[in-house]
Structure formats: structure tokens, C-alpha cells
């Protein structure tokens, strides 16, 4: 399978490349810099230069790689998870997640139905009995901060679910 990973140099993207290569998939990694190209090449992926916030460059990357699956692990989280750094990174992280997701989904595919896996979140589930699964509701009636996070992830999933030609999987971890 031909797999394109957006967010390939992050904490999840790097081991994901290794796992996919071990299973003999052809792996492409969306990168913005020569340093990132070097990292993903060392891991066995083919770098594809594009900026997730630039729809034209994302379209060109999709056209070039013709993936059967796109895995969206895009974030813009700080190196250290202090309250101050998280606040400082929040606006950019939100932009990367929303616009990057939209650009990846908007790129037309001519490879038939494409699988689209999106990093979602399990942190925003509504309380319930037993284990939660992908059908569990987000906590929309929680505190303002939790409800905002829940709405954000629900919106990302809804956009993917509404995209024609996409077999969507929300990765809630």
C-alpha cells in the first residue's frame, strides 16, 4: 500500500514510519525542511516537500505520491508541555490541525477510494460506564476548555466523514 503521512517527524509519526516499512508499505512523508527530509529518509520514508497550510503544495504532494492511504498526524505542539508553552502554541496548533486537515481532504484523488486516518483524541470523551470506543460521544457539556476541545475534534472528524471518496478512521488516543 502507498501511504502518505502528514506529521511524520512527530512522536507518533516516526515510529509509524518504522512500523509501516516493516510491513513493507511504500511510505511517503510530508516535510517542510531539509532537516525533516533527512530524518524521514533515515527512517525509510520518501520525503515529499509540502506545507500542510498551503493547499496547492498539498495537492501537488497527493498528485505526486498517489497514496492509497493518508495518515494525518499533524500538530504544532511545543517541545515542553508547560502551561505557558502550551498556551503559546495553541493558536498555531489549532490552525495546523484545522487547515492541514482541510487541505489533505480537499486534494482530489484519482486512485479510487482513499483511506484517511486522522489523529483525534480520547481525552474529550463524555463520562460513561465501561470502556469508550469510537462511537462514544465527546464531552460537549463539560467545562469551557474541555467542551472547546471536544468541539474541535468533533469538527475535524465531521469534515472527514463528510468528504466523498474517503474511507475515514478517527484515531482516538
Residue ranges and their predicted role:
Residues 3-25:
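N-terminal Rossmann NAD(P)H-binding glycine-rich loop of SDR-like oxidoreductase domains
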Residues 3-5, 70-71, 116:
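Conserved hydrophobic beta-strands of the Rossmann-like cofactor-binding core
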Residues 15, 19, 107, 159:
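Rossmann-fold NAD(P)-dependent oxidoreductase module
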Residues 25-32:
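Conserved glycine-rich Rossmann-like NAD(P)H-binding loop of the short-chain dehydrogenase/reductase
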Residues 28, 48, 169:
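Conserved beta-strand positions in the Rossmann-like core of class I SAM-dependent methyltransferases
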Residues 34-41, 45-103:
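NAD(P)H-binding glycine-rich loop region in Rossmannoid oxidoreductase-like domains
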Residues 80-147:
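Conserved Rossmann-fold NAD(P)-dependent oxidoreductase catalytic core, especially the SDR/UDP-sugar
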Residues 115, 120-121, 157-173:
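Conserved beta-loop-beta element that borders a ligand/cofactor-binding pocket
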Amino acid at each position: 500500500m502507498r501511504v502518505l503521512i502528514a506529521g511524520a517527524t512527530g512522536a507518533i509519526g516516526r515510529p509509524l514510519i518504522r512500523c509501516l516499512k516493516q510491513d513493507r508499505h511504500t511510505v511517503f512523508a510530508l516535510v517542510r525542511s531539509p532537516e525533516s527530509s533527512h530524518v524521514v529518509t533515515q527512517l525509510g520514508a520518501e520525503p515529499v516537500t509540502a506545507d500542510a497550510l498551503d493547499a496547492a503544495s498539498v495537492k501537488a504532494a497527493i498528485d505526486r505520491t498517489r497514496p492509497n492511504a493518508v495518515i494525518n498526524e499533524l500538530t504544532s505542539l511545543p517541545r515542553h508541555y508547560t502551561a505557558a508553552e502550551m498556551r503559546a502554541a495553541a493558536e498555531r496548533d489549532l490552525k495546523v490541525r484545522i487547515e492541514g486537515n482541510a487541505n489533505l481532504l480537499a486534494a482530489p484523488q484519482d486512485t479510487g477510494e482513499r483511506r484517511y486516518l486522522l489523529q483525534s483524541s480520547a481525552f474529550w470523551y463524555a463520562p460513561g460506564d465501561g470502556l469508550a470506543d469510537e462511537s462514544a460521544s465527546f464531552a460537549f457539556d463539560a467545562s469551557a476548555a474541555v467542551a472547546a476541545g471536544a468541539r474541535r475534534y468533533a469538527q475535524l472528524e465531521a469534515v472527514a466523514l463528510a468528504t466523498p471518496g474517503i474511507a475515514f478512521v478517527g484515531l482516538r488516543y
